[in-house]
Amino acid sequence: MLELLQRDAETRALLVFPTKALCQDQFQSFNRLLSAVGLTGYLVGVFDGDTPADLRRRLRDKGSVIFTNPDMIHAAMMTQHGRWSEFLSCLSLVVLDELHVYSGILGSNMALLLRRLFRVCRHYGAAPQIMALSATIANPEELFLKLTARPCVVVDRDGSPRGKRTTVLWNPPRIRQTNWRSRRSANVEAHELMARLIANGVPTITFSKAKMTAEMIYRYVCDKLREIAPQQASKVTPYRGGYRP
């Protein structure tokens, strides 16, 4: 994307994320990247339900890179595509993050939305390249074809430099005092492991399936760190959907 901007200042990119939290996070990261490489003068912003009206107009008319979600493409861009003609006519790249999310009914809706988007782009003389990303999918080529009706080239090898990595599958221990088949709570194991790792200076991220579970693990980790490494307790923070920017 940076190469596209460097080659052509008029190019446009649309980055699509399934959640507002992820969209905001990637927007902040991209801004830091632009600053690091010295690319200035480009209007980059988030276009979602919380975006003020004046910023929406500026992004529509002058935006180079827009971070958004499927709902906003459907409700704002497609229903008023005439107002977006300048952006859509210069659209060179569409990025679909977390591709695996789009399955079932959501996937069907997304497939139809993308077909509408690309049809409107053709109407304005644009043929954007599509880039999709996912770390948890077994059939990326098949899903990409179903969603976009276009063939793709799968890049499934990470060529970036990295240090040694160890993968451990952790099974909570059995509780002998009760039923032999019972095991300790995975959430309890998770917060104890996280606290021990942080106390030993290991940067740690813990994922959970629900927002409430994330908050619960966060509280337990902080409580544990106050016992074993008080200086680290203030360095832990939860991050989930539902927070305001």
Question: Which ranges hold each PLM region?
Answer:
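Conserved helicase ATPase motor motifs in RecA-like P-loop NTPase domains
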Residues: 96-106, 113-143
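Conserved SF1/SF2 helicase motif Ia
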Residues: 2-25, 39-40, 122-126
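Conserved interdomain linker/interface between the two RecA-like ATPase lobes of SF2 helicase motors
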Residues: 129-133, 137-214
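Conserved ATPase-coupling elements of RecA-like P-loop NTPase cores
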Residues: 26-27, 55, 76-81, 98-113, ...
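Conserved strand-helix element at the start of the C-terminal RecA-like helicase core
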Residues: 12-26, 194-224
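Conserved helix-turn-beta segment of the N-terminal RecA-like "Helicase ATP-binding" lobe
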Residues: 22-48, 146-152, 225-228
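Conserved helix/coil segment N-terminal to the catalytic DExD/H
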Residues: 49-92
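Conserved helicase motor
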Residues: 44-56, 70-71, 158-159, 209-212, ...
